[in-house]
């Protein structure tokens, strides 16, 4: 199936590793030219070189700290200066601190909201004027299923993700009229560095081994395993493509059936 992505310009935040890197690679494999954004310059350059070598398509690395409003605008401006425009924005950067509310500090909450929520807001605000002028665009927000099914041990990510989901649906209604489709993907557990940190924290909190915590996590998923970054990327690439041209305001759950939804 031709996804119609050849020649499209995509900006992927959090693109130096994990899900973001897999999404950028997936887009490049379909012929898109990708810009990737992250804070760490070395990891960013390495990721860009790796994707270029694997796909034969240009990847433009641009460093930025999306907790800073001026950085989000600068990143978008740099991508437009380099490629001419942006067709696709994939908001992926940021992970909120986990833990129960009594263990979270004000700083933890600030981190959760500044990167996981306000980072999405800032990048979206920066690209929207350009997409409005072209009357076309795709915004894919990679969020997390605890925004719909909150967890006590993940209270700050749950809150930030819920805010991202609300923004997705609200903006889809507002900007769909202008040819801009805005959708969300809610992954469950995904095998990334972030998951390794999270499962380690769960193991310590429950006073069990990491192997046992991993086993229990896998058992909670009907498919019996953790999702891969590439599986999230496959969905994101499709949602960003012309083949999903009537998808707008959708929230796609990608958790292997882990969380019940129908009346619970």
Map each language-model feature to its residues:
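Substrate-binding pocket helix/loop in short-chain dehydrogenase/reductase
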Residues: 100-101, 108-113, 139, 217
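Conserved glycine-rich cofactor-binding loop
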Residues: 9, 16-18
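Short, small/polar-rich loop/turn modules that mediate ligand/substrate recognition or access, typified
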Residues: 176, 181, 247-249
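Active-site loop-to-helix junction immediately N-terminal to the catalytic Tyr of the SDR YXXXK motif
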Residues: 104, 150-159, 170, 198
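Short C-terminal tail/terminal secondary-structure segment
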Residues: 149, 237, 248-264
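Alpha-helical segment proximal to the catalytic Tyr-Lys
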Residues: 129, 173-174
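Active-site helix of classical SDR
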Residues: 124, 160-161, 168
């Amino acid at each position: 199936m031709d996804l119609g992505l050849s020649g499209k310009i995509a900006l992927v935040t959090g693109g130096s590793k994990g899900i973001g890197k897999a999404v950028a690679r997936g887009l490049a494999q379909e012929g898109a030219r990708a810009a990737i954004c992250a804070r760490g310059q070395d990891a960013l350059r390495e990721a860009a070189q790796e994707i270029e070598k694997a796909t034969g398509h240009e990847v433009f690395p641009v460093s930025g700290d999306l907790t800073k409003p001026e950085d989000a605008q600068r990143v978008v401006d740099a991508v437009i200066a380099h490629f001419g425009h942006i067709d696709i924005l994939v908001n992926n950067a940021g992970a909120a601190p986990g833990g129960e509310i009594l263990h979270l500090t004000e700083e933890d909450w600030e981190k959760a909201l500044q990167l996981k929520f306000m980072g999405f807001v800032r990048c979206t605000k920066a690209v929207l004027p350009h997409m409005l002028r072209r009357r076309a665009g795709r915004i894919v927000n990679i969020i997390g299923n605890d925004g719909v099914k909150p967890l006590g041990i993940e209270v700050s990510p749950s809150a930030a993700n819920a805010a991202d989901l609300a923004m997705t649906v609200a903006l889809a209604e507002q900007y769909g009229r202008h040819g801009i489709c805005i959708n969300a993907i809610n992954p469950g557990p995904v095998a990334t560095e972030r998951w390794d940190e999270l499962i380690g924290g769960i193991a310590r909190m429950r006073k069990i081994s990491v192997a046992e915590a991993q086993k229990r996590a896998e058992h909670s998923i009907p498919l019996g395993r953790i999702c891969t970054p590439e599986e999230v990327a496959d969905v994101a690439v499709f949602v960003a493509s012309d083949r999903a041209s009537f998808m707008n305001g959708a929230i796609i759950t990608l958790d292997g059936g882990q969380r019940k939804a129908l009346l619970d």
